[in-house]
Curated annotation (Swiss-Prot):
Monomer. Interacts with PqqE. It holds the Pfam family PqqD. Keywords: PQQ biosynthesis. The keyword Nucleus does not apply. One of its GO terms (molecular function) is quinone binding. Belongs to the PqqD family. It comes from Acinetobacter baumannii (strain AYE). It comes from the Bacteria. One of its GO terms (biological process) is pyrroloquinoline quinone biosynthetic process. HAMAP family: PQQ_syn_PqqD. Pathway: Cofactor biosynthesis; pyrroloquinoline quinone biosynthesis. Functions as a PqqA binding protein and presents PqqA to PqqE, in the pyrroloquinoline quinone (PQQ) biosynthetic pathway. The lineage of its organism: Bacteria, Pseudomonadati, Pseudomonadota, Gammaproteobacteria, Moraxellales. This is PqqA binding protein. The gene is pqqD.
């Protein structure tokens, strides 16, 4: 799937064995999985907070725009994150 074909009605869910959380020792959000940990940058952490298995990508974009203002790049940033996260097997898109 590429960015032009991406369906913002898809709902991202964390894959089994992957857990998103704030890690004080890392001073940021991380994804924990059986083999280790991925430290997320601030933007990825902001997006990850809204992945709850009920919000579709469009709703996540709307919530981030409400939180940070109507920044045009938010749409592309969220879609890029979803594509990378799916490619890395962190999330499923259903």
């Amino acid at each position: 799937m590429n960015k032009e074909q991406f369906d913002v009605n898809l709902v991202p869910t964390w894959r089994q064995g992957y857990r998103f959380q704030f890690e004080p020792a890392q001073n940021g959000f991380v994804i924990l999985y059986p083999e280790g940990m991925i430290k997320l940058n601030e933007s990825a952490g902001a997006i990850g907070q809204y992945i709850d298995g009920t919000n579709n990508v469009s709703a996540i974009i709307a919530q981030l725009k409400q939180q940070f203002g109507d920044i045009p790049e938010i749409d592309n940033d969220v879609i890029d994150y979803m594509l990378v996260a799916q490619q890395q097997h962190w999330i499923d898109l259903v």
